[in-house]
Amino acid sequence: MSVDAPVSHRLRAATRDDLEFQFRLYASTRQEELAAAGFPEAMRESFLGMQFEAQTSHYSLCYPSAEWLIIGSGGEDAGRLILDRAPDHLHIMDIALLPGFRGRGIGTALLRQVLAEAAEKQLPVRLFAFTGERATGLYRRLGFESIMDDGIHTELVWRPAK
């Protein structure tokens, strides 16, 4: 296997037993932001817990049919994908990997899977990202275009070829 070859992955449905892992994953995606903002270390865990609970509740209430999937790689839980299949589009609500699994091709492979499904169904794919976040470059390379940017969030859409 070459160094550039993507690491294989698997998907499985998330269960209640995965909540601790999902919190740890969520916290890993916010650490740099909180450190850069000077957020006191002692308050981070509590703050992250509240934010994680708010995000989980929002997604569950607003997107009750969304699929919550745990990404596995090499026998370990590596991340999660939350995907809502609306009648007129696919919505990637969240895609996140633990730091040790980033930059290994897993996210790209997952996104390509979603795009292949959308292309087959002739549906667009939507997602939101923080403006300027590293993954935005990946989304653009895969054909996503920005349709809204409020300075904090960017909404991106991918459209299948006709």
Residue ranges and their predicted role:
Residues 89, 118-130:
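Conserved GNAT acetyl-CoA-binding A-motif
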Residues 98-104, 131:
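Active-site acidic-Proline motif in GNAT/NAT acetyltransferases
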